[in-house]
């Protein structure tokens, strides 16, 4: 599953 990224709280 995609992990949360530090970009606008989106996912990788």
Curated annotation (Swiss-Prot):
Disulphide bonds in the chain: 5-12
Domain of life (superkingdom): Eukaryota
One GO cellular component term noted in the UniProt record for this chain: extracellular region
Cellular compartments annotated: Secreted
Expression sites by tissue: Expressed by the skin glands.
BP term (GO), one: defense response
Keyword terms: Amphibian defense peptide, Disulfide bond, Secreted
Identification of the protein by name: Riparin-1.3
Organism: Crinia riparia (Streambank froglet)
Lineage, uppermost ranks: Eukaryota, Metazoa, Chordata, Craniata, Vertebrata
């Amino acid at each position: 599953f995609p992990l949360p990224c530090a970009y606008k709280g989106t996912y990788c």
